[in-house]
Regions:
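Functionally engaged cysteine thiol sites
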Residues: 31, 36, 57-59, 121
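Signal peptide processing junction and immediate N-terminal pro/mature segment
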Residues: 21-23
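Positively charged n-region of N-terminal signal peptides that target proteins for export
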Residues: 1-8
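Sec/Tat-exported extracytoplasmic proteins
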Residues: 35, 43-47, 63, 155-159
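Bacterial N-terminal signal peptides
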Residues: 8-19
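A short, solvent-exposed beta-edge/loop patch
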Residues: 25-26, 32, 95-159
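Short N-terminal segments immediately surrounding and downstream of signal-peptide cleavage
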Residues: 25-43
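Short, solvent-exposed recognition patches
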Residues: 45-118
Length: 159
């Protein structure tokens, strides 16, 4: 009887592990979402190959004072990426501006610090159950919005 319980528990654990792996495999690796030529075309500069920032679901490219980051949102603190998106879209913080963005994904918004571009300009995109952010640095705000939107449209095609 004890061995049947151990076998059953092992099977359940195996199936649970497999489901975690398959759902993790559904999330693109950050550096595979955008290519060096796509980044270079959008920014107008030659950029380094993409490198993960802190996790495989993030990536950064840079060159000539321009930086592009891509971050694919993951579940966090019991909230799905879509829940995080909806919360961030509604949240107001002093000095931080969010603006709706159209024409990319199912829903999107820009996020930036008012009156400066030191912290870059992000475009947070929801497509289906996926959420990602393209953030650009080294551009004035109008340029940053154009560059981030160009790259976000290309990234959205991978989700």
């Amino acid at each position: 009887m004890r061995s049947i319980g151990l076998i059953s528990a092992s099977i359940v654990l195996f199936l649970f592990s497999f489901s975690l792996l398959s759902s993790a495999a559904d999330v693109p690796v950050g550096c595979s979402v955008l290519t060096q030529p796509q980044i270079a075309a959008a920014t107008g500069v030659t950029v380094s190959p993409g490198a993960p920032i802190s996790a495989p679901t993030s990536c950064q490219w840079s060159g000539s004072g321009k930086i592009v980051t891509l971050t694919i949102r993951q579940p966090l603190a019991g909230k799905s990426p879509v829940d995080q998106f909806n919360d961030a879209k509604k949240k107001t913080l002093p000095g931080i501006t969010t603006e709706p963005a159209s024409g990319v994904g199912d829903d999107a918004f820009y996020i930036f610090y008012a009156g400066q571009n030191r912290a870059g300009c992000g475009l947070v995109v929801k497509k289906g159950t996926s959420v990602f952010e393209v953030r650009v640095y080294g551009f004035d705000l109008a340029q940053a919005k154009t560059v981030s939107k160009t790259l976000a449209k290309e990234a959205a095609a991978k989700f």
